[in-house]
Amino acid sequence: MVRWQLHGRSGYVPHERIFRDVYLLHRPEQCIEDYFITTDIHGSTAGVAVRLRYYDSAVATRITLYDAAGTIVGSVTPVEAPDDAAFPYHAEITIVDPTLWNAEQPYLYTLVLDTPCETITDRVGIREVHVANNQIYVNGQSIKFHGVNRHESDPVTGYAVGFEQTKKDLLMIKKHNFNAIRTSHYPDVPYFYQLCDQYGFFVIDEADNESHGASEYYCEGNESWPNHVENWNKPIADNPEFTEATVDRTRLCVERDKNRPCVIIWSMGNESAYGCTFEEALAWTKSFDPRRLTHYESAQYRSKNRKYDFSNIDMFSNMYPSLESIQEYLDNEPDKPYIMCEYSHCMGNGPGDLEDYFQFIQSHDGLVGGFLWEWCDHGIYKGKMPDGRGIYYYGGDHNEWPHDGNFCMDGLVYPDRRPHTGLLEFKNVYRPARVVKYDRESGMLTLHNYMDFVDLTEYAALTYQVSCDGEVIDNGFIPYPDGFTLPPHSENALPLAVHIPDKGKCFLKIFYHCDKDLSLRSEGHLLGFDEILLENEDSRNQKTLAMWSDAPSNSTITVQETDRHLTLCGKNFTYNFNKLTGLFAAMQYEDAVLLDKEMEFNIWRAPTDNDRKLKLDWLAARYDHCMTNAYRTEYQVTDSGVTLRAKVGIAPISLQKFLDLDVCWTVSNSGAVTLALHAERNTVFPELPRFGLRLFLPKEMARVSYFGMGPMESYCDKHHAASHGYFSSTIWQQHEDYIRPQENGSHYDCDYVQLDGAGIKLTAVGAKPFCFNASHYTQEELTEKEHNYELHPCDSTVLCLDYAQNGIGSASCGPRLAEQYRLDDASFDFSIRLIPEKA
């Protein structure tokens, strides 16, 4: 065995030794050495051309094409083609009314090459691909890539990924509505492509060219990005000494995979800059295979010293672009379509911008889609925790160098292929169809089909569900009317009459189910759903309204005051209020302790991986070490209870105050506690991680029920896999166990949440929808620990009631969080009510 390279890094944990199958194949002395299958479509016919090359001399060969049912379509004998030095024998079979191959309908013919001493069988997909009008067309249809980057990686076997492992990945990828894969950053095992042919994926096949790490050593002491770009290509990409090596790697990729219909784009490599070596690789590729498209993102990284040839590149590619930068490109009259070879970095809790990218992709023809980074976390399995969860190491945990820490934990699935919530988010964002509108008066439901090739009626069955204040009040099957069609990229309306109550928060959900057993997705498989808020006379949650009403009470509250505290005593409760912080230090209801420690105004969250740049600003502002001080506190006893008012400031240790709060607490005679505050923020400080209340409840309060977006975690920019409803679970089930601990488990757009246990219940209800998080881990613990197996639960149930959280985004390796998701309000109001009850 000859080692291919001495050193190499492609963005994930390095391994050694042989990791691909090595085999010896005994063949006849005279046989077919190689063949190249191409297809052409001519109206209602198609041609399947086979070019052959023999070892030594030609042998008698019969080429037969079968359809998927096993019927012979055509059979021919190759003839000599002396003008073709590479493949000097040709054959062609013409098919009338062919069934074409695409990612949604991966129809395959079988080609058999018979010689006296052996038989070779291959599968053929008839398809064409070309660029026109800055769009990519397959079989004459403009397509969008809903793609993902995929490394070959397994937590136990490393790079050695077998057939069943590959099949499992592709099964999951297909079930979550992807239609394309980029083989980052090298050609995959051969059976990967055969499975992609069969299951239906468009593939960008990438040659094993990468010099990202090496480029860092040639910046001549200037680490600025412009200097990096200017000098990146000098040592390798624009150095003629590397031309043969670069072309050789490209040639090996192209020649091996040339017969796979799933491959529609050849990629020259990754992050290697541009120069003469890649000009030659592209020219060779286009000469050898002009029917496919070419891609190379690093073409934009070159020096200004000379003109470069980009004529053999079919698209402009970029990584992690902002929507603004894409718009700038499209506004500049480009001559190539725009493709995002990597976007929406999926590291940890994220990504949070998938819906925004989807809307932009669909509304701009020149943007042909993209490929998420990336499929899986590259953790190394190291055994199990006592509770059975896996222990996974990442960069540096083996004391190796160099490494990128947990930057290899950047996938949509955990190392063992459990889905991240980001994968569920993608699945529903890229559902096959969407509701355009629902007209209550006419009872007509308008749908848009986002498929590229298939009529929705041939693919998806529809069901519906109507809920009111969290209770399902109607559901059923939606039949397609006679003659109804919904072709790709079109809209149509069908009838759906539902009963909508006059009062209550009502939602209509439309579910899309796989109509038959298609491409790994069994009949009934949920493809996605829509949720529509239904208008009625009073769309407020009626249960929430009732929680804001106090039951009549003849009891009163007495107040005892000291220099530091106010003690409020009611019929069945005692609350201790800290005059120095403007917060309750202790709460006891029906002889049950509600607070293990003083509640807090809370602005910190355990930084997500997507906060890794922003957290530097947060730490500089010392948001993780803040003090709360009340400057003036007063109270008033009324017939209905007690009102407490305080002027409160929040400041980091040794820095100036950045939040001024006008706080009003109202305690009713029944023991309900209502907070209403107005906040003014010093906008010199960075956006807030969050703002809200943090309560430390007894750990026995270990069950949570809520009306909001669930059941999985949800955030202001990451909630499309969730839906509104009433949900109930344990506190442990709320935790999303990311390999590197971080903020997780929040729920967005909630009306109320209730925790109970040990004979006591506490309900929090918002004047407006709020966010909450309930956990046995503190945000400090999640911030401090580097691995999930290092986490220790606290002795309380931690309940965070948030006015809002900063969005999630994908800034771990992408643009800054979009402005509309930043918690940077100059002022805001927040009101929430706490209602204790005996269980």
Language-model features, listed with the residues they occupy:
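An acidic-aromatic loop/edge-strand motif
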Residues: 1-46, 50, 54-57, 111, ...
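Extended substrate-binding grooves/exosites of carbohydrate-active enzymes
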Residues: 6, 27, 120-446, 450-458, ...
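Surface beta-strand/loop "capping" patches
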Residues: 29-56, 420-460, 547-563, 677
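Beta-strand-rich binding/interaction modules
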Residues: 45-80, 444-479, 494, 504-514
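Beta-strand/loop-rich accessory regions of lumenal/periplasmic or secreted enzymes
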Residues: 102, 497-504, 532-839
